[in-house]
Amino acid sequence: MAKKVIRVIKLQIPAGKANPAPPVGPALGQAGVNIMGFCKEFNARTESEVGMIIPVEITVFEDRSFTFITKTPPAAVLLKKAAGIESGSGVPNKTKVATLKRDKVREIAELKRPDLNAASVEAAMRMVEGTARSMGIVIED
């Protein structure tokens, strides 16, 4: 018989840098999960992606065991890295902060596609372009 799920926790943690300090510790402590066990496993699994923020979905079972799934970094983080900027525009409709080529957007869309609800790469590209627009990044051909 399958184990009973008691909670699903969603967090965004820098790759390779999970530690028991907030926000990880309190979120997992409330669920009764072995915090250090999670941190070691997460850091080992994400050590190749250091510097990125990795969304993680932790499933906690009745016997306090857990499994977790790491997802691709948020589109906004990938766009900021590609454009070489620290943050998006405060007024994206007036102030543009960077320009990206459509090829770079395609790369990001292909990377994000498993986590996006998109039927094709073109649909995923439109989603990524929308995120870029809302950050004040101009997309050119």
UniProtKB/Swiss-Prot annotation:
GO biological process: translation
Domain of life according to the entry: Bacteria
Gene Ontology molecular function terms on file: large ribosomal subunit rRNA binding; structural constituent of ribosome
UniProt cross-references to PROSITE patterns, sorted A to Z: RIBOSOMAL_L11
Alphabetical list of InterPro entries matching this protein: Ribosomal_uL11, Ribosomal_uL11_bac-typ, Ribosomal_uL11_C, Ribosomal_uL11_C_sf, Ribosomal_uL11_CS, Ribosomal_uL11_N, Ribosomal_uL11_N_sf
Post-translational modification: One or more lysine residues are methylated.
Statement: the UniProt record of this protein carries the keyword RNA-binding: yes
UniProt keyword list: Methylation, Ribonucleoprotein, Ribosomal protein, RNA-binding, rRNA-binding
One GO CC term, this protein: cytosolic large ribosomal subunit
Matching Pfam families: Ribosomal_L11, Ribosomal_L11_N
PANTHER family linked: 60S RIBOSOMAL PROTEIN L12 (PTHR11661), LARGE RIBOSOMAL SUBUNIT PROTEIN UL11M (PTHR11661:SF1)
Free-text function comment from the UniProt entry: Forms part of the ribosomal stalk which helps the ribosome interact with GTP-bound translation factors.
Family per record: Belongs to the universal ribosomal protein uL11 family.
Subunit structure and binding partners: Part of the ribosomal stalk of the 50S ribosomal subunit. Interacts with L10 and the large rRNA to form the base of the stalk. L10 forms an elongated spine to which L12 dimers bind in a sequential fashion forming a multimeric L10(L12)X complex.
Protein name: Large ribosomal subunit protein uL11
Species in which this protein is naturally found: Brevibacillus brevis (strain 47 / JCM 6285 / NBRC 100599)
